[in-house]
Amino acid sequence: MSAMQRLRLACSVILSVAIGSACATPADRSVSLKLAGTSWQLVAIQSMDDAQGTTRVADPARFTLRFGVDGRAGLRLDCNRGSGSYEARPAGDGSSGSLTFGAIATTRALCPPPHLDERVARDLGHVRSYLLKDGRLFLSLMADGGIYEWHRQPD
């Protein structure tokens, strides 16, 4: 094999590896894509304190969470709106992992009672993990602070 043929072979191998790597989806990106582009409605807030129990959301359509493909989250919090960044890091098959939200900016309209909007906005800053199961999204708060249950929003 001549030097020119070895050079062509080496260039072909390098080019093939580069193209293959560019087409491959890293695990972190693929899991983020499981959340990216999805929308959810809040149905319940489960407290780890038995005295508080579970708070059911009367109208789930008034509390929505949308994960954008750009790493931004959009929220409807009763009569308010919010947005902020998010970062998902998968564990295992991607149906669970760590999830954190950046600062959430919200409008400040005074919603009618019960006032869950402020609680949800505040608690999103304490989310540490997620679980996708049976068309539901569970967000766990740090220090056993509770679990938010969301159902997939109809398209």
Model-derived features with residue positions:
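Sec-dependent N-terminal signal peptides
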Residues: 8-15
